[in-house]
Each structure stands twice: as C-alpha cells, then as structure tokens.
C-alpha cells in the first residue's frame, strides 16, 4: 500500500512539474502570426506589456497578452482570439457581431461593451455597468447576469 501511494505521489509531482513551466515574455514573435496580426489590426496604440504562454496537458498552448493600457487578450493555440477585456474602454466594434451590437444599442443605449468572450456556445459580452449578456451562435440573446 505504501509503495502504491509513493508511486502515485511521484507521478503527480512529475506531472505537476511538467506543466508548471508557463512562460512569460515580451517577445511578440512568440505569438502565432494570427494573434500578432489581430493585435496590430485592432490595437495599434498600446504596446505589449507581457505575454503569458500556458502549455496544456496535451502540449497545446494558449496565450494571454496584456497590453500597456491594461487590455487583456486571450488566444487559443492557433492564435484565434477567445477573450478581449478592455477594462473600462470599449471593445473594438469590428469584433462584436452585428446582432449583439444592435441588441446592446436598443436595450442599453448609454452603455459600451468592455469585454467580449467567444466560445462554442456563442458570445458573452460585459457592459461598462458590469451587466453580462449571453448570446447563442446565431447572435440571439439568451440571458443576462448583473
């Protein structure tokens, strides 16, 4: 029993050490080309403060980029954005689906979208008033959290 427990602890420690190697850099060349192009297209003024490269269990990478204006952008292993958080500034309008923009304009005319996250089920946006709105893949409103 002690031998099995010792082996289990050793295996867990080895696995944990293997994936504790997140890399933090300022070198934009560490990002996939798609991610670099995205940043250059939508965020021309703020510079990259740092990039955190996380390696997953199967070796896939994800990238978390912090810009000097505190904007945070997450990218998947292919360099496609998954999350853009501009804190209290507006997310670039070109990133927001038309139906989502229209819904926010009609129902929250005084608010700006400060964060957008896209996933398999659709899009979630956060407004400056901290309301969170969820939309399905077709851009239809699903729910709201405050």
Predicted regions and their residues:
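Bacterial Sec-dependent N-terminal signal peptides
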Residues: 1-23, 39
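Interaction-mediating elements
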Residues: 21-146
């Amino acid at each position: 029993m002690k031998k099995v427990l010792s082996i289990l602890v050793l295996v867990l420690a080895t696995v944990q050490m293997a994936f504790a190697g997140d890399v933090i850099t300022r070198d934009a060349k560490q990002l996939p080309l798609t991610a670099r192009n995205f940043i250059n297209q939508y965020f021309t003024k703020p510079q990259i403060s740092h990039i955190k490269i996380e390696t997953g269990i199967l070796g896939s990478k994800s990238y978390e980029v912090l810009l000097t204006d505190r904007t945070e952008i997450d990218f998947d292993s292919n360099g496609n954005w998954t999350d853009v958080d501009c804190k209290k500034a507006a997310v670039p309008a070109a990133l927001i689906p038309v139906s989502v923009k229209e819904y926010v304009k009609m129902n929250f005319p005084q608010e700006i979208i400060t964060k957008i996250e896209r996933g398999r089920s659709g899009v979630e946006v956060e407004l400056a008033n901290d309301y969170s709105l969820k939309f399905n893949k077709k851009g239809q409103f699903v729910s709201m959290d405050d």
